């Protein structure tokens, strides 16, 4: 699977990775960004801060009742927000980003062909870095399909 590590979740994830005989392969380092609508009031900014975003709805993925916040898909999911909406799928998240001028925190990697031109990534100022990569089992080689997937991931982060 693909995941990110940062200062908040690194110790927990590295412990889990080691205990399950997995290996983390870093694909890239990224500074946090926000996905917002191209029509969002802050869309013309070169950078934004969490303080500037506080009055807009924060959208995040529902993690289920038994999942630890260390495994969250978003890097600020444990912080309280004025307006927080949890969704279960990417299409709903993007529709609410556009319809409600919401935002979500991400790596900044976006594919216009896949996501359309209505969503943009804007750098989030002063929030620390992310190490993005994938995991494999230490003692099991990737299948041919797995190798193709990893090569596609590498192409995505290089473009």
Question: Which functions belong to the PLM regions below?
Answer:
Residues 75-85, 118:
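A local structural motif
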Residues 18-25, 29-31, 91-140:
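Beta-alpha-beta core module
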Residues 6, 10, 50, 54-79, ...:
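Secondary-structure junction motif
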Residues 49, 141-155:
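Short amphipathic alpha-helical coupling segments at ligand-binding clamshell hinges
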Residues 24, 58, 84-86, 121:
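Conserved beta-strand scaffold positions in the cores of enzyme catalytic domains, especially
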Residues 1-5, 9-11, 102-107:
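Paired acidic/hydrophobic, glycine-rich loop segments that form the ligand-binding mouth/hinge
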Residues 16-58:
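Flexible hinge/capping segments at coil-to-helix
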């Amino acid at each position: 699977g693909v995941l990110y590590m940062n200062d908040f979740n690194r110790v927990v994830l590295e412990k889990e990775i080691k205990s399950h005989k997995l290996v983390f392969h870093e694909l890239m380092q990224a500074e946090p960004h926000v996905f917002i609508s191209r029509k969002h009031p802050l869309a013309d900014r070169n950078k934004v801060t969490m303080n500037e975003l506080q009055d807009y709805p924060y959208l995040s993925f529902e993690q289920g009742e038994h999942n630890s916040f260390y495994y969250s898909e978003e890097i600020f999911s444990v912080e309280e927000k004025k307006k927080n909406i949890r969704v279960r799928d990417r299409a709903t998240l993007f529709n609410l980003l556009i319809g409600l001028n919401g935002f979500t925190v991400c790596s900044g990697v976006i594919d216009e062909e896949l996501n359309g031109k209505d969503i943009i990534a804007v750098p989030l100022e002063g929030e620390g870095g992310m190490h993005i990569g994938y995991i494999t089992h230490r003692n099991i080689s990737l299948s041919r399909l797995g190798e193709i997937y990893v090569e596609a991931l590498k192409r995505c982060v290089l473009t």
